[in-house]
């Protein structure tokens, strides 16, 4: 669960997009609410070992129908606010989690869609979660009993600083260190499950893989969560916990928790809330599916920021519109696999909503290090994120199983293992931006070409295509272009693709031969051609000139001819596609009587010498000697005729 800087960026994002002048003021006003102690000492919760890093070992599988219980939990001093009655609360969360299942995205709760809507779309309907809402149950104690934190204190004693578990009268406290968050969270989980089992009996349906274990349980508790800065430190911190619990004879493999409300505004030091969006729920459920966090758990480096729901992307539009899974995350789940790029090519990539995939560029010096390229546009679940920036996202991955399993993917600032290559070479993210304006300016230029119009990523550009093993990738991306239809075109290991030649009409068509020419193509050194009959290639070759003489054909053959331009080195240019074809027929090997026709034809002697052009029915008026002549029609057809 990523800590939200102050409510700072959260509230800034909630303002109308035209209110540019307010962003810096609001950012600075709220920044004091960002507790330095909290943002720098999140160690235990954020770094707690999780069974993440592999879908194969995840508690919840990412394919097929998976049933998940969602337990609504109120406290002795805090009830739900999304509705006035328990029935209303249940109905709200039924749709919040499951939507309507009628093929239409459910937006009635203010989010871009329901939890189920998100995962069905991201998985191409491979993963079909079904959420069973239970409760609300009411716990025996106040929220502070379950959410209180434990601190250690550094106290000045004489000239020394000592660490104590408890502050005594007269102690001079230098600072405090968070040693444990939500000290009674285990009691929260076990009590919530026990009370839920009193009102709901059929828990066997949540053992999706038949291993006699409930795969997971998700809690939604009433009120705010501690993840929003300025919040009460006694609130529970949303998270996913991989800790087996046995309650009433049932084994629960893991649980996750999120809050009902989020801060919407602040007045006279009182935070006014509204129902939270789907973002945090999606983030925590993704942990149960095996994904680690992609933010820097030390709150220093850029990580993935808004470009992943496993980082700040869960808070898109204040959590109401988290972004799409990245191409890496969809590949991780086995939903839409990455395509390996190994040969020079020119790609035109749609965004995910339009069927696009991600492409993997392997570092030849390391099997675990690679780039992923994908197209992010303001479409589908990227509708809000796409307002921040759009274009080609280049993600640098340096996989290490141990780092993934320990949930420390981006915890080393100078060796981030899952982060973007920013087109503007700027990484002022939520951890380091001094203002909302600076943060948004960074995002606007992160993707290629971005607002800095960076069309290339090579070993020599800024930024350069660097890797940890080997120094440089040596696989350039050039001419990165966003097209009007929302696709992105990129040249991989090449300057581009040659234009297809423009064919002229064939000439000198005889029974067994013809000539044909085409326009020359810049940077082409050769041309490949094919002669096709009945769908099969009957002749092919390569020539250096923009013309070819073809012979050895059969009479009366209906032919297709096309050509493509070729370059010497694919790293300079790659071959063109095939040209548009010319269709025509060779001459027949029989002689027709002079036809009656008013069509204009060219008349040739039997050895191919042009004689004249006229209408067919006028030929008998001309002073031709008796003999065989060839009539060639404007559509390329020819025939032999006998003039007596």
Task: List each language-model region with its residue ranges.
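Active-site recognition of the HExxH zinc-binding catalytic motif
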Residues: 219, 279-293, 373
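C-terminal tail/sorting-segment detector
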Residues: 19, 587-590, 626-644
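Extracellular fibronectin type III
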Residues: 555, 568-587
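Residue-level detector of functionally pivotal "anchor" positions at catalytic/ligand-binding pockets or at interdomain
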Residues: 495-509, 581-607
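Active-site-proximal segments of metallohydrolase catalytic domains
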Residues: 52-60, 109-251
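Non-catalytic C-terminal accessory/binding modules of secreted extracellular proteins
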Residues: 21-31, 81-145, 151-152, 229-271, ...
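Conserved aromatic anchor
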Residues: 512-524
């Amino acid at each position: 669960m990523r800590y939200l800087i102050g409510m700072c960026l959260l509230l800034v994002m909630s303002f109308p997009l035209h209110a540019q002048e307010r962003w810096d003021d609001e950012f600075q006003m709220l920044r004091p609410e960002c507790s330095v102690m909290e943002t720098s000492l999140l160690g235990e919760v954020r770094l707690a070992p999780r069974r993440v890093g592999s879908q194969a070992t995840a508690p919840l599988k990412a394919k097929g129908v998976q049933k998940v219980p969602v337990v609504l939990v109120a406290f002795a001093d805090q009830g739900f606010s999304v509705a006035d009655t328990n029935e209303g609360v249940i109905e709200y969360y039924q749709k919040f989690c499951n939507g309507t299942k009628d093929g239409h995205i459910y937006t009635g709760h203010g989010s871009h869609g329901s939890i189920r809507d998100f995962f069905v779309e991201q998985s191409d309907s491979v993963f079909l979660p079904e959420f069973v809402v239970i409760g609300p149950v009411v716990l025996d104690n106040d929220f502070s009993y379950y959410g209180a934190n434990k601190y250690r204190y550094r106290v000045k004693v004489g000239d020394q600083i000592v660490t104590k578990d408890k502050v005594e009268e007269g102690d001079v406290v230098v600072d405090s260190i968070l040693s444990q968050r939500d000290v009674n969270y285990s009691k929260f989980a076990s009590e919530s499950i026990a009370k839920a089992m009193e009102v709901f009996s059929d828990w066997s349906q949540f053992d999706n893989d038949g291993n006699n274990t409930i795969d997971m349980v998700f809690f939604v508790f009433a009120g705010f969560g501690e993840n929003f800065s300025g919040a009460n430190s006694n609130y529970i911190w949303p998270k996913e916990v991989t800790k087996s619990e046995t309650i009433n004879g049932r084994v629960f493999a893991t649980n996750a928790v999120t809050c009902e409300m989020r801060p919407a505004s602040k007045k006279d030091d009182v935070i006014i809330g509204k129902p939270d969006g789907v973002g945090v729920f999606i983030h925590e459920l993704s942990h149960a599916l095996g994904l680690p966090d992609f933010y820097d758990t030390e709150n220093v480096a850029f990580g993935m920021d808004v470009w992943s729901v496993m980082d700040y992307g869960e808070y898109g539009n204040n959590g109401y519109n988290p972004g799409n899974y990245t191409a890496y995350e969809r590949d991780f789940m086995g939903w839409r696999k990455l395509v390996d790029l190994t040969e020079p090519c020119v790609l035109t990539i749609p965004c995910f909503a339009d069927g696009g995939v991600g492409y993997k560029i392997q570092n030849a010096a390391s099997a675990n290090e690679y780039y992923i390229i994908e197209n992010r546009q303001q479409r589908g679940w990227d509708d809000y994120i796409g307002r921040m920036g759009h274009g080609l996202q280049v993600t640098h991955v340096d996989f290490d199983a141990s780092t993934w399993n320990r949930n420390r993917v981006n915890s080393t600032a100078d060796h981030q293992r899952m982060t973007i290559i920013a087109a503007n070479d700027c990484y002022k993210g939520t951890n380091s931006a001094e203002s909302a304006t600076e943060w948004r300016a960074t995002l606007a230029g992160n993707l290629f070409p971005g607002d800095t119009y960076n069309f290339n990523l090579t070993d020599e550009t800024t930024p350069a295509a660097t890797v940890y093993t080997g120094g440089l990738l040596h696989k350039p991306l050039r001419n990165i272009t966003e097209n009007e239809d929302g696709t992105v075109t990129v040249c991989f290991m090449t300057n581009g693709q040659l234009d297809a030649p423009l064919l002229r009409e064939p000439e000198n068509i005889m029974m067994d031969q013809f000539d044909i020419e085409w326009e020359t193509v810049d940077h082409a050194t050769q041309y490949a051609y094919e002669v096709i009959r009945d769908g099969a290639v009957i002749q092919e070759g390569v020539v250096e000139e923009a013309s070819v003489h073809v012979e050895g054909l059969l009479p009366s053959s209906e032919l297709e001819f096309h050509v493509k331009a070729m370059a010497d080195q694919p790293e300079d240019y790659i071959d063109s596609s095939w040209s548009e074809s010319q269709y025509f027929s060779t001459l027949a090997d029989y002689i027709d009587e002079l036809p009656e026709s008013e069509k204009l034809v060219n008349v040739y002697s039997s050895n191919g010498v042009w004689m004249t052009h006229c209408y067919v029915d006028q030929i008998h008026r001309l002073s031709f000697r008796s003999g065989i002549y060839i009539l060639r029609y404007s559509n390329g057809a020819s025939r032999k005729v006998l003039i007596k």
